Amino acid sequence: MKRATTTKSFIENGSVLESSVSIKIKLDDLSGGEVVELLEEHLADMYATSPAESVHALDLDGLKSPEITFFSAWKDSRLLGCVAIKELDTQHAELKSMRTSQFARKSGVASQLLQHVLDTAAVRQYKTISLETGSEDYFKPARNLYEKFGFGYCEPFADYVLDPHSQLMSIELR
């Protein structure tokens, strides 16, 4: 388990926390109700914002595949977000199911989760991390985050094809 700290504020029980927020990012087996609810919310939003044929988010069973490692972020007993990494081959992995809980948005949690995945990828010696996200305005904050971390737009990878509703991005690790 990795402990990360963010100094940005987030709302908890109706009040804004101004001090540093210590979060725990842990390997997750997808058995907890809070995680299942967050993933159901994630899928519902994906289908509400993109045509069904352009939704590449995985359901619970898909995330339990052996090539996928799933992480969740917590403050005490409160779920802040989740992310997964899918091994495509020994040098290439895909970021999947990045989601921040509604109350924890704009608090730095997504940055902590993304950094955790990049650190995990470096330890596993992947050379490239790729991802698919939507092209709609709803996904602009996610694209901005990925760009901030150095991801650039790329050609289709794995089983993806060009799609006007998708943006494909990747980063080369050092």
What are these regions (language model features)?
Residues 39, 95, 129-131, 139, ...:
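Generic structural signal for conserved hydrophobic packing positions in ordered secondary structure
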Residues 111, 136-155, 162-164:
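Conserved active-site alpha-helix within GNAT-family acetyltransferase domains
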Residues 121-134:
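Conserved GNAT acetyl-CoA-binding A-motif
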